[in-house]
Design a protein with these regions (language model features):
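Acidic/polar, glycine-enriched structural segments that form the non-catalytic walls/loops
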Residues: 2-9, 106-113, 124-363, 380-384, ...
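Well-ordered alpha-helical scaffold segments within catalytic/enzyme domains
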Residues: 18-26, 46, 91, 122-127, ...
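Helix-terminus loop motifs that line ligand-binding clefts
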Residues: 35-36, 47-92, 382-404
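Short Pro/Gly-enriched beta-strand edge/turn motifs at strand-loop
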Residues: 67-73, 100-106, 228-231
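Short, solvent-exposed loop/turn segments enriched in Ser/Thr/Gly
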Residues: 115-120
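An alpha-helical repeat/solenoid feature that recognizes helix-turn-helix modules
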Residues: 363-369
Length: 404
């Protein structure tokens, strides 16, 4: 990587809300499996095949360290660049260059867009040597993103937008405390122009073993079992089943290969607020997840253009105070917004921070105070959404202590 790359302790990949919140804790995207912000695995794997040889660009095939497995050779990471709304990785060798961009739709001037439960992974492959190359790109996200513990069971299915897995309404909003992850609702993957697959670690290892070739039939062995709303059930710790997709194309000196993967999460109900199960802001006016997710798929290009324009605007303002200040903002912007959940209660917005530890509390003043400047600048309504629940709670009988 370039010596000047800014490398924070954790690099944002998927930043939607406190539960759908995945980061890379390593300098290279392929050094370790991506993780939830609590530190637990939310594995994602990326494999690129170039002229019959497999390279790994994201995560690990075998996520259990005690299970010895010779991982595919990584495609060397050349750089990682952060902007307020995007993380851009570049990989390459003497034949091809692969650029992978993780984008969050976190624009504070548009609450519908900011609260949208979707995140983008866009990739582009180009020929470096000017020659023609056959390329296959495979990307997955594991069902770990839909459970609190790997002993839990998930269901898999397919719908008009793509494929999904999860636990539905089972156990919804029944846990509180430290070190918890969502274990209800549905994790979704959509990938236009890709082949959908559902595989586990064993499937991936079998497909990659014995030869340098990625055996596509083994990657698709479960695909034929799926039809609309038909479920396959599997325990997460039994092989870490994943939602996956792959695409094959050719690149040369003129033609590049591109692909778009959209990750989404339908949490059904988001927060229990004074005894009432409250929904996310994006659900207001009766909107369904399928409708909102389809809109996220269709609007990628427009969202990408808007986020890039915002990034440039913020960069121009921040660089007045120095490059290091801008680097910090590139991490803090997504971290702060995705540490909150935006809901609507009786026509009023509520914007809750969520602790991953510190008792797992929401709406804590010690988090609200330092984060307020961001929202005063870009969306003061969210400041009201932070403070109103605190006043509501303080006015009630639940808090009986003489201190704040």
């Amino acid at each position: 990587m370039a010596a000047k790359d800014f490398l924070p302790r954790a690099i944002p990949l998927v930043t939607v809300d406190p539960y759908f919140n995945i980061w890379s804790f390593s300098d290279h995207l392929y050094d370790d499996t991506p993780r939830h912000w609590t530190g637990h695995q939310n594995s994602m794997t990326g494999i690129i095949r170039v002229d019959g040889k497999n390279y790994r660009f994201m995560g690990l095939v075998e996520t259990e360290r005690e299970m010895y497995y010779l991982e595919p050779e990584p495609l060397r990471q050349l750089s990682v660049k952060l902007t307020p709304t995007r993380t851009v990785y570049t990989f390459g060798n003497e034949a091809v260059e692969l650029r992978v961009t993780f984008t969050g739709s976190l624009l504070l001037d548009d609450l519908d867009l900011m609260s949208r439960p979707a995140s983008y992974v866009f990739y582009e492959v180009r020929s470096v040597d000017g020659k023609a190359h056959e390329v296959t790109v495979y990307l997955d996200i594991s069902s770990q993103a839909a459970v609190n513990e790997s002993s839990q069971t998930v269901l898999f299915g397919k719908d008009e937008n793509g494929i999904y897995c999860g636990r539905g309404e089972e156990g919804m909003l029944t846990r509180s405390g430290d070190d918890l992850r969502i274990d209800w609702g549905w994790l979704h993957l959509a990938a236009p122009d890709h082949q959908y697959v559902i595989v586990n670690t064993k499937d991936k290892k079998n497909a990659l073993s014995g030869s340098p070739y990625l055996h596509l039939p083994k990657f698709t062995k479960l695909d034929g079992c799926l039809s609309d709303r038909v479920h396959l059930e599997q325990e997460v710790r039994e092989g870490i089943p994943c939602l996956g997709c792959l695409k094959t194309s050719g690149v040369d000196g003129k033609e590049t290969m591109t692909g778009l993967v959209i990750l989404g999460y339908d949490d059904i109900h988001s927060i229990e607020y004074f005894g009432k199960q409250a929904d996310a802001y994006w659900k207001r006016d009766g909107r369904s997840f399928d409708e909102v997710f389809k809109k996220a798929i269709d609007e990628y290009e427009a969202v990408s253009a808007r986020t890039q324009a915002f990034d440039e605007e913020l960069k121009k303002e921040a660089l007045v105070y120095g490059e290091e200040y801008y680097d910090i903002l590139c991490v803090a912007y997504r971290e702060s917004i995705a540490a909150h959940k935006l809901i609507e209660v009786d026509g009023e917005i509520r914007f809750f921070s969520k602790e991953c530890y510190s008792n797992g509390c929401i709406g804590t003043v010690d988090v609200t105070y330092p984060s307020i400047p961001l929202y005063l600048k870009y969306q003061p309504k969210l400041v009201e959404g932070m403070i109103d629940p605190i006043f509501h709670y303080a006015a009630g009988d639940d808090w009986k202590f003489p201190y704040a």
